[in-house]
Amino acid sequence: MVSARALLWAICVLRVALATVYFQEEFLDGERWRNRWVQSTNDSQFGHFRVSSGKFYGHKEKDKGLQTTQNSRFYAISASFKPFSNKGKTLVIQYTVKHEQKMDCGGGYIKVFPSDLDQKKMNGKSQYYIMFGPDICGFDIKKVHVILYFKNQYHENKKPIRCKVDGFTHLYTLILRPDLSYEVKVDGQSIESGSIEYDWNLTSLRKTEKTSLDSRDWDQVEGSKVQDWEKHFLDAGASKPSDWNSELDGDWLQKPPYEDGLKAEGIDKDVWLHQKMRPAGYLTQYDLSEFENIGAIGLELWQVRSGTIFDNFLITDDEEYAEKFGKATWGETKGPEKEMDAIQAKEEVKKAREEDEEDLLMGKFHRHNHFSRFHRQGEL
């Protein structure tokens, strides 16, 4: 008999097996990455990328990724894949980024584009669906961008989400669900979540109902004056007041007393139902969490100091698969990466001390020679 644990494990394996992976990139095949990634030539001054694991790493091959190489440059590179729509599905976007140069000002975010992106001409004005990831500049800007594109406008999450600012590799994950919830994870830990509607101020774009002031198809029957109309409005016993001024008060008319039970005749009494009106910015529920033609992922950013490494790109519809992929990549190398950095730091400290001691000894030697020369000169 199959145990409950074995059955549960089998279900988990099956679920991961059924996950749809739209894009996955680890740069494990040497220079073949150049066949998949397109460097934009829109500007001859765009910075260039190389594939490298950097100055320190957890695994020399597994930690290789796209690295920026030139200071004070804009960068633009992208990779395309088979277009898809995430309608009614979860969308997970994940990647790793390492600012080993200790970023002072520059972007570490990615962009997800529609399939009609002109990769050769990609630039800062190219339309994108999603912008996600860290952005650092000075002391003021240390945030995770989550920008979504709706109705020809870019909307940024109104919550401040802080990014990592050290020089190690970090795993960034964005999850958009069809129930209009979202979640942002850093290093596998949830740091922000909520409603797409409210955290992007999109409630005004949702479907609303307005009562119309008039209805074009309303068939109002025209009434006609009844034969004894005057008797309802003239009072034979009434007389004109003595102080009535026709020039100021107008013509005086006899007014009948109110008759209880007076009913209107010849009037359409059907119930009139208001129409449902759609405002100009009308969006259905799914419009707030779906993108019809996702077909490319890329880096379009500015950096003052280069050296950032981007790796382990993933776009899928399965949160569990993304979690397992993160553990199998970043999770396996994060520890050894820190160990290598610590070893290098100790070696640098040791080298600096040796250089200081050498400088000190050389300084004493020079001072001794100078004194000897001065003493000999005094004897002459």
Swiss-Prot record:
* Region of interest (C-domain), residue spans: 292-380
Cellular component aspect of the GO annotation: endoplasmic reticulum lumen; nuclear envelope
Give residue numbers for sequence motif Prevents secretion from ER: 377-380
Entries under SUPFAM superfamilies matching the protein: Concanavalin A-like lectins/glucanases, P-domain of calnexin/calreticulin
Tree of life domain: Eukaryota
Q: Is Zinc tagged as a keyword? A: no
Q: What residue spans carry the region label 4 X approximate repeats? A: 191-246
Instruction: Name the keywords, alphabetized.
Output: Chaperone, Differentiation, Disulfide bond, Endoplasmic reticulum, Glycoprotein, Repeat, Signal, Spermatogenesis
Kindly list the biological process annotations in GO that this record carries: cell differentiation; spermatogenesis
Cellular compartments annotated: Endoplasmic reticulum lumen
Q: What does this protein do?
A: CALR3 capacity for calcium-binding may be absent or much lower than that of CALR. During spermatogenesis, may act as a lectin-independent chaperone for specific client proteins such as ADAM3. Required for sperm fertility.
- What name is this protein filed under? Calreticulin-3
Q: Origin organism of this chain?
A: Mus musculus (Mouse)
